[in-house]
From Swiss-Prot:
NCBIfam families documented for this protein: cinA_nterm, molyb_syn, PncC_domain, PRK00549.1
Protein name in UniProt: Putative competence-damage inducible protein
CDD domains: cinA
InterPro entries linked: CinA (IPR050101), CinA-like_C (IPR036653), CinA_C (IPR008136), CinA_KH (IPR041424), Competence-induced_CinA (IPR008135), MoaB/Mog-like_dom_sf (IPR036425), MoaB/Mog_dom (IPR001453)
Pfam family, one: CinA
High-level lineage: Bacteria, Bacillati, Bacillota, Clostridia, Eubacteriales
SUPFAM superfamilies linked to this entry: CinA-like (SSF142433), Molybdenum cofactor biosynthesis proteins (SSF53218)
Highest taxon of the lineage: Bacteria
Protein's organism: Clostridium tetani (strain Massachusetts / E88)
Amino acid sequence: MNAEIIAVGTEILLGDIVNTNAQFLSKKLAEMGISVYHQSVVGDNGNRLKEELTESFKRSNIVITTGGLGPTKDDLTKEIGAEYFNRKMFLHEESLKNIKNYFKKQGKILNENNEKQAYFPEKSTILPNNFGTAPGCIMEENDKFLIMLPGPPKEIIPMFKDYVIPYLKKFNEGVLISKVLRICGMGESKVVTEINHLIENQTNPTVAPYAKDNEVTLRLTAKAKNEKEALSLIYPLEKEIRDILGNNIYGTDSDTLEGVIGKFLIENNLYIATAESCTGGLLCGRLVNYPGISKCLVEGIVSYSNNSKMNRIGVKKETLNKFGAVSEETAIEMAKGVANSSGADIGISTTGIAGPSGGTYEKPVGLVYIGYYIKGKSFAKKFIFPGDRQSMRNKTVTVALDYLRKNLI
């Protein structure tokens, strides 16, 4: 079975709200083995919605609409659905009763226009709304399914889980299972080059690369009769990719760099401290994202000025005078200094030129040094990251964590 999603609402077209419903629906449909072929947005215009329904049903046998079930005149989704299937509208007494009870519980008076929400196309399966006043419905005809859902996420999510999923499972066989491999230290083009033969020859399972937030993900997806069979298709492919990419793969599914590192530090009773200049606390902040990091994170210092570098973490004045604040030598002394002063096993530092000004020919904007002190061993890495100030800082943090991971785990 193939599906399409149509978001109805001028507010979405204008960018006033973000269409998170499509993301939720696509994920849930994929879990059921239903492929989403197309997504679209139409304003509160009946003719355009009808045109979109016509085109959608040429490609797919399931069309899901979100929005347009409200009480106003421009909420026309159900009426257009009825026109498309040549059906009349009828008053669903139970839905009207539920709407009245909802208003009563809210201490409000039912407006006459809210009764409009209790009207549905004939022969519809009604989907109760336990969190609002707009019930949904499903129309079925000649192996075509039109599923009309409300717009607010707090209403559509429980409605889809409680009513739509059980309904569709009666008609759909098989599951679509995905596993995500998370990669750091390689760009998307490099990853694709290394595993291109797997991507070009894919059928089932499939491999889909995606770059985001200075990392690359590979989504491995298999379709089978059940989850066990799907995973048996994914595992050999995963092993082959791991053999190629090695320790550039840091985790799977919902893993994060900071989570992988934090878990390792806690399990091995290791303590860490950070000293940051150009990243201004972002590095420590990433570590704090991991619940339980208090068991191993001693402190984080933002030593932005030279005085702070000298007085707080013991960077030598001679080092700053000779090499400058942005240098390998300073980065090493920062990492070692924060580890020694805090009693941590590991110190990590950042110092660089985030821009947009302040760069020179020898030390351009984007230059950064990341220093490490790991159980008595000190070293630093030099990088030049293009982009604006914020992207440079974010990239620095991700790379700093990844090099720490590769030197620890």
